[in-house]
């Protein structure tokens, strides 16, 4: 035991900003000292309805007075309700609830492998992924992502994942072997730098899967639940996956994840093949249903798209006027990235100085992830602060070199 007065009790796995927030209201976070920040980090795309949304708060309070947790050996009506609503709104026939995106990806991977097994192809267990991907922090999902910085020191890489360069059709086709079970990708890579696969490439991947008897697995943990202006990002390309992992926005801040699949893809996931202690608990299911009450309401997606347009136009103006600071806008809807010329950490700090919270990403990108309830008027206010931050960096870095 160490001296609790001198040693911090938590793992040293986070480089935390010196900010402490006491409460939140809509798109705002308020510190212990009463300072207000516009939260365009949204818990890394989690707080889809902002902070203290009245419908979510009331739903959680009501459910907390009834049931918190039940084992999945019993029927949970709210779980069946949320599952049915997701099925009715998507390609899927079946849903498995988890507590996080990583767990949802684990379920997706197991579902794909199990499908091939019960289809008479036990040799098909490998999953093709794309360089720059991020699929979670479990041993299997860091192997799926393939990034060395997340694999270092954790022993042998879990077998069964093959990375190919981003958007490379030839490499993708060459990676397919008799052992391949499926292809896994994020429609827009989040941590990978807000790199969006072109719609035509997504359609091509769907075609390649069909031609080779493979399953298409989508990681919509960050892109899903309205973040891009449609319920799920793959809808823009008009494709239907076989399996999809979701989390983040579906809970609005409460830890919920889910793996969605067609009946065919899920046919191997029979009793005893997978399980979870907390996944699908009554508290989480109540909140998930409350989130869908709002997200599926008439006019909600239109507001997301209208706010996204305001943000895109404002950020485009900054790229035009401050090319020594930012060079490109990436992403879609309210999943936005600014490709930086200065170090992205400099822009993150400059934004924080202007009381705008943002998130870093790979490829020297800064993510802006406004809550989906952000109005065009609030977006315009935020853009004023963003411009001030960018202008200050421009003055300080008149001849910045590309990082």
UniProtKB/Swiss-Prot annotation:
Q: What is its main location?
A: cytoplasm
Identify the metabolic or biological route this protein is part of: Amino-acid biosynthesis; L-arginine biosynthesis; N(2)-acetyl-L-ornithine from L-glutamate: step 4/4
Please give the superkingdom of this protein's source: Bacteria
Kindly list the biological process annotations in GO that this record carries.
Answer: L-arginine biosynthetic process
Query: Which cofactors go with this protein?
Result: pyridoxal 5'-phosphate
| Cofactor descriptive note | Binds 1 pyridoxal phosphate per subunit.
Name the Enzyme Commission number(s) assigned to this protein: 2.6.1.11
A Pfam family of this chain = Aminotran_3
Q: Which residues carry this modification: N6-(pyridoxal phosphate)lysine?
A: 248
Q: Which GO terms describe its cellular component?
A: cytoplasm
Query: Which residues are involved in binding pyridoxal 5'-phosphate?
Result: 101-102, 134, 219-222, 277
Which InterPro entries does this UniProt record tie to the protein? AcOrn/SuccOrn_fam, Aminotrans_3, Aminotrans_3_PPA_site, Class-III_PLP-dep_AT, PyrdxlP-dep_Trfase, PyrdxlP-dep_Trfase_major, PyrdxlP-dep_Trfase_small
Task: Describe the family membership recorded for this protein in Swiss-Prot or TrEMBL.
Answer: Belongs to the class-III pyridoxal-phosphate-dependent aminotransferase family. ArgD subfamily.
Subunit details? Homodimer.
Know the name of this protein?
A: Acetylornithine aminotransferase
Task: State the organism named in the record.
Answer: Brucella melitensis biotype 1 (strain ATCC 23456 / CCUG 17765 / NCTC 10094 / 16M)
């Amino acid at each position: 035991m160490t001296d609790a007065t001198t040693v911090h009790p938590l793992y040293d796995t986070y480089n935390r900003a010196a900010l402490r927030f006491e409460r939140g209201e809509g798109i705002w976070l308020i510190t212990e000292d009463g300072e207000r920040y516009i939260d365009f980090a949204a818990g890394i795309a989690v707080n889809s309805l902002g902070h203290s949304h009245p419908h979510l708060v009331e739903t959680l309070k009501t459910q907390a007075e009834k049931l918190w947790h039940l084992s999945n050996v019993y029927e949970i009506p709210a779980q069946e309700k949320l599952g049915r609503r997701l099925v009715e709104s998507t390609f899927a026939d079946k849903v498995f609830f988890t507590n996080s995106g990583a767990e949802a990806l684990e379920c997706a991977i197991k579902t794909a492998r199990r499908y091939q097994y019960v289809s008479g192809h036990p040799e098909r267990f490998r999953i093709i992924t794309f360089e720059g991907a991020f699929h979670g922090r479990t041993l299997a999902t860091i192997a799926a992502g393939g990034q060395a910085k997340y694999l270092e020191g954790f022993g042998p890489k879990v077998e069964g994942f093959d990375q190919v360069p981003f958007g490379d059709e030839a490499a993708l086709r060459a990676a397919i072997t008799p052992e391949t079970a499926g292809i896994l990708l994020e429609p827009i890579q989040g941590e990978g730098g807000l790199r969006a696969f072109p719609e035509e490439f997504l359609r091509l991947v769907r075609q390649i899967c069909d031609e080779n008897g493979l399953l298409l697995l989508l990681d919509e943990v960050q892109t899903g639940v309205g973040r891009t202006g449609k319920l799920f990002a793959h809808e823009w390309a008009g494709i239907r996956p076989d399996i999809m992992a979701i989390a983040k926005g579906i809970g609005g801040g409460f830890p919920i994840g889910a793996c969605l699949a067609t009946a065919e893809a899920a046919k191997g996931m029979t009793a005893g093949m997978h399980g979870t202690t907390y996944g699908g608990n009554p508290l989480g299911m109540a909140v998930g249903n409350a989130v869908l009450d709002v997200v599926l309401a008439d006019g909600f997606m239109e507001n997301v798209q209208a706010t996204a347009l305001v943000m895109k136009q404002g950020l485009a103006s900054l790229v035009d006027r401050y090319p020594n600071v930012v060079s490109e806008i990436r992403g879609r809807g309210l999943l936005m990235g600014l490709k930086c010329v200065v170090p992205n950490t400099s822009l993150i700090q400059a934004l924080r100085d202007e009381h705008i919270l943002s998130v870093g990403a790979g490829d020297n990108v800064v993510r802006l992830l406004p809550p989906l309830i952000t109005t065009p008027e609030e977006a315009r206010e935020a853009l004023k602060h963003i411009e001030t931050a960018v202008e200050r960096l421009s003055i300080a870095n008149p001849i910045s070199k590309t990082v």
